[in-house]
Amino acid sequence: MDNDGPRSMTIGDDFQENFCERLERIHNTLHSINDCNSLNESTTSISETLLVQFYDDLENVASVIPDLVNKKRLGKDDILLFMDWLLLKKYMLYQFISDVHNIEEGFAHLLDLLEDEFSKDDQDSDKYNRFSPMFDVIEESTQIKTQLEPWLTNLKELLDTSLEFNEISKDHMDTLHKIINSNISYCLEIQEERFASPIRHTPSFTLEQLVKLLGTHTETTEPKVPKFSPAEDILSRKFLNLKKNIPPIEKSLTDILPQRIVQFGHRNITNITTLQTILQKKYELIMKDYRFMNSEFRELKVELIDKRWNILFINLNHELLYILDEIERLQSKLLTTKYTKDITIRLERQLERKSKTVSKTFNIIYRALEFSLLDAGVASKTNELAQRWLNIKPTADKILIKSSASNKIATSKKKIPKPKSLGFGRPNSVIGTITQDFQERVAINEGDSNKTPENSTTVALKGKKLGKALLQKMNIKPATSPNSSNAINPFFDPESPNKGKLILSSVPPLPYDETDETTLRVSRGENEKSPDSFITSRHENKVQITETPLMAKNKSVLDIEKDKWNHYRSLPSRIPIYKDKVVKVTVENTPIAKVFQTPPTKITTPNSQVWVPSTRRRTRLRPPTPLSQLLSPREGRLDKTPTY
């Protein structure tokens, strides 16, 4: 270390290397003393030479520390370098302070070992000569330690000061300065994007978009960026991100950092005012950049929010002015000149549509005024247009009310015929009538074409000839349907007699043609007739039915089913009867039938009282006891009691 005066101190590389080596040897020697368990020469490294080296290092450091922490020798020019050096060697210096406080503990352990050696009974003449100098080194080192402790307190204060200075200057201020500079760059980037096309131009929008955008505003929120395109949406997101970064910077820079600088100035070291002044100057530089960032952010906010909202509503005021002029012209046209009904209706519709647009636009502007989105100039212009609209509106309302009343009267007098559809649900008779009319029209056209020009009293138009040629070219034929399709179909008949009735049966009451008795007999299928005669008679009956109009009556499905049941009920049964003669003879010859009583079968339900009879083996049923045996005389029954 070279001293160049009372106010300057230079820490050279040689001094740093020598000083750090001594601190390291002091630490290693204390560690060896604490780990030593015996002073035997063969097992320990503790010797007089080691203790003498420890004493020399401790004495040298004790001579340097006072000059290092002397309040008078801390120069203003070198104070930052000294703070950096303390910060660089902080771990070694804190370790040295801890070692000095532990010297007494290490020496006490060494004295215990020496006492153990002298308490032994062995006759070692060199023991006193070997251990006696150690007592002198311990005593002298203890004295140096006592002299060094006050300077170590000052050294610890300097180390704490350097740590706090580094935290405020580098960790807090430098980091905050970097964040501010990055936000300034981000703000300038957003300004460049805002000036790009088409964002710098007047935004194009609809009233629905404007209403939706105003719906996102509330009385507590700040105005938002008017965005009507994807590019404006991206720009709005970037602006919001920049806006979120500013409050933490402002809180840290205006509230936290000044208090830390003031608290740092309360430390009791030499030239602390110099260090505080350095921090204050650095703080002023950061505040300068912070003010520039705020000014750029406010300009960006004015460009993106305030000016764009003003331009937007200035354009709305221009549109309102043009629309009000058009409404006045429409009113003068409708009041001074009479036009045809079609033109009058068109003009009234234009007046109604423009009146609604004006009212809706004023409602939007007044809602924007509630959120303070307009400046005083735009608001005053809007108020002038609103007063003009109040003067025009009564006349427009009077015209529209009169038009609405006349339209209602015309609508009530006009009869709207019911459209006739040719599609699904139309009776076949109507379709047949239309087809017949079409056929007659085609026949008339063909008759006209066969006439000569002399016989024809009228000259055929060119369009009719062209239509006739197209019909012949396309080969269009009229749609015809059989007469059977004219029968009533209850599923598609709009005038069905079953309409309005509650039908509970699964089969709807469908009408069918009744048949006579001959057809009924044929349908029953008598066994005497052959298949050929059956087909012939059926054909004849069908001819008779079609020729007789009185047989075309309707009969429901239920009546037909009833007749079918009555018919089959009158016929004899065709189920074969099986006659078991062997069983019958056995029953007649057996004087008494043996009845086997078997236990009842299992009841299906707990409450059932029905027992099912069964045989013992459940393979076949026994024949019943003849009635003659059951009604035989008492004596006969006693003799012929069946065995169970």
UniProtKB/Swiss-Prot annotation:
It comes from the Eukaryota. It is found in: Nucleus; Cytoplasm, Cytoskeleton. One of its GO terms (biological process) is karyogamy. Its main location: nucleus. InterPro entries: Karyogamy_KAR9 (IPR013889). GO terms for cellular component: cell cortex; cytoplasm; cytoplasmic microtubule; kinetochore; mating projection tip; nucleus; spindle pole body. The modification Phosphoserine is found at residue 496. Present with 656 molecules/cell in log phase SD medium. This is Karyogamy protein KAR9.
